[in-house]
Amino acid sequence: MVRSKRQMRLGLFVQAAGHHVAGWRLPKAEAGGENLALLQRIAATAERGKFDMIFLADGLTTAKDAHPSMVARLEPLLLLSALAMSTSRIGLAATVSTTYGEPFHVARAFASLDHISNGRAGWNVVTTSYARSAVNFGRQHPEHDERYAVAAEFVEVVRGLWDSWEDGAVIKDKAAGRYVDTDKLHVLDHVGNISR
């Protein structure tokens, strides 16, 4: 019997002010989730260190008593797009909520990151458990079971949107004057509770 070679996967969870609530206060600490140059150095170091993925969490609310990393953070997909330019191999994953997002926007944003990074995008699907997030969207916060039902359909719609363009749809045929092969584009005809 041949045993397969098992390898550990390493992911770096990046927090704006560090993981310890007071870590950013150490004399040599270089905290700053809004400092792109610092984050690019961290990403490049993680890639050289053979990490498989960088992960950016996100939340849609904050509070005065929140951990500093929950307050001072940039929008993760935009930040990961910038980090894609200073890395070439490491995966780029972010949290995006299904409760307070729209499937089309999420599908488009992750597809864009995936193209920019040459296939390195990853999505941490969450339903947003913090009820105080709802006020930022002018909504009532749904109960647990409803959030998870929405999440299941949301992911189904996003995956369907990703699959609506076949591989090789972009042909850039100058002679024929065709940028896209429209036979390889498909309309997602989803009818459900969250999307029509």
Residue spans for each PLM region:
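Internal, glycine-rich beta/alpha segment that forms the wall or movable "lid"
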Residues: S4-Q7, E102-R196
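Active-site beta-loop-alpha junctions enriched in small/polar residues
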Residues: Q15-A17, G59, S97-T99, V126-T128
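Hydrophobic faces of well-ordered beta-strands that scaffold small-molecule active sites
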Residues: M8-L12, I54-L56, I90-V96, G119-V125
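A generic short-segment signal for beta-strand/edge and adjacent turn/coil regions
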Residues: A22-R25, F51, A63, G91-A94, ...
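Low-complexity, flexible helical/coil segments
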Residues: A44-F51, S88-T95, T127-S133, V157-D163
